[in-house]
Curated annotation (Swiss-Prot):
Subunit text: Interacts with NKX2-2. Interacts with ZNF488.
Region annotation Disordered: where it falls in the sequence: 1-107
SMART domains for the chain: HLH (SM00353)
Organism whose genome encodes this protein: Homo sapiens
Name of the gene this protein is made from: OLIG2
UniProt protein name: Oligodendrocyte transcription factor 2
Biased composition (Low complexity): 76-93
UniProt KW keywords: Chromosomal rearrangement, Cytoplasm, Developmental protein, DNA-binding, Nucleus, Proto-oncogene, Transcription, Transcription regulation
GO biological process: axon development; myelination; negative regulation of neuron differentiation; negative regulation of transcription by RNA polymerase II; neuron fate commitment; positive regulation of oligodendrocyte differentiation; positive regulation of transcription by RNA polymerase II; sensory organ development
UniProt GO molecular function: DNA-binding transcription factor activity, RNA polymerase II-specific; E-box binding; HMG box domain binding; identical protein binding; protein dimerization activity; sequence-specific double-stranded DNA binding
Pfam families named in the record: HLH
């Protein structure tokens, strides 16, 4: 009885919120499946109308978004289903081909594949063993056999080290035999201008011959003036010690001009120096100190050239001196 009285006493306070939410309920019931106006919820009666409107808007938007998500996922699922159907069709065709093959044919195919793989691995092991034999560590004390990857890495390091050593050796050889040789032999002895005999040495044929055989040596340490003075002193000593009545012509007139003289000044200076009336050329060849010159101009000609090139007037004199 007390509960019934409380319900009756509390009933007059409820119509006010019901009257407030009546338009909203009628609007919501028009789009829903429930058409009765007596169906009500206790939640709208407890909440203000503004909050309930926001909740309804949020629920409507949430209802729209899941539809979109479902639509996108539906497209993805359709594409994935297409690809899976293609792969399944290919697998089924392969299975059909294998099913069409008999059991002996399948066994033969498996044996062929296994033999091919076995041969490939056998060749690889032989190649790796050959590589291990030529590695430097193979000739040392007995060590554990390296794996394939370790052997390949070690071989790579050795190849890089040997390449660097070879490049360094080439550079050193080019500096030793290339740079200095090119500095002392300009244009590979093609345009060399060996110094002609000095004017003081052209007074006597023997001095001219000595000057032609031994041109002025330009020592890399001595200055050019000292080298010229030393050459003049050597020519004077030879002229004082030579026979005064010698009828032999000068070696400069005997030897033909060098064929490697390509520059006009050097080619013109060679015949003038050989005749005994020319002036000395200034640009001489820088020889190595204490070492013979490798070019053919500084080499002593063989004796048969002297005999064949001698004049006809000097031969009777030689025979008379011999008698």
């Amino acid at each position: 009885m007390d509960s019934d009285a409380s319900l009756v006493s509390s009933r007059p306070s409820s119509p006010e919120p019901d009257d407030l939410f009546l338009p909203a309920r009628s609007k919501g019931s028009s789009g829903s499946a429930f058409t009765g106006g007596t169906v009500s919820s206790s939640t709208p009666s407890d909440c203000p109308p503004e909050l309930s409107a926001e909740l309804r808007g949020a629920m409507g938007s949430a209802g729209a978004h899941p539809g979109d998500k479902l639509g996108g996922s539906g497209f993805k699922s359709s594409s994935s289903s297409t690809s899976s159907s293609t792969s399944s069709a290919a697998a089924s065709s392969t299975k059909k081909d294998k099913k069409q093959m008999t059991e002996p044919e399948l066994q033969q195919l498996r044996l062929k594949i296994n033999s091919r793989e076995r041969k490939r691995m056998h060749d690889l092991n032989i190649a790796m063993d050959g590589l291990r034999e030529v590695m430097p560590y193979a000739h040392g004390p007995s060590v554990r056999k390296l794996s394939k990857i370790a052997t390949l890495l070690l071989a790579r390091n050795y190849i890089l080290m040997l390449t660097n050593s070879l490049e360094e050796m080439k550079r050193l050889v080019s500096e030793i035999y290339g740079g200095h040789h090119a500095g002392f032999h300009p244009s590979a002895c093609g345009g060399l201008a060996h110094s002609a005999p000095l004017p003081a040495a052209t007074a006597h044929p023997a001095a001219a011959a000595h000057a032609a055989h031994h041109p002025a040596v330009h020592h890399p340490i001595l200055p050019p003036a000292a080298a010229a003075a030393a050459a003049a002193a050597a020519a004077a000593a030879v002229s004082s010690a030579s026979l005064p009545g010698s009828g032999l012509p000068s070696v400069g007139s005997i030897r033909p001009p060098h064929g490697l003289l390509k520059s006009p000044s050097a080619a013109a200076a060679a015949p003038l120096g050989g005749g005994g009336g020319g002036s000395g050329a200034s640009g001489g060849f820088q020889h190595w100190g204490g070492m013979p010159c490798p070019c053919s101009m500084c080499q002593v000609p063989p004796p048969h050239h002297h005999v064949s090139a001698m004049g006809a007037g000097s031969l009777p004199r030689l025979t008379s001196d011999a008698k």
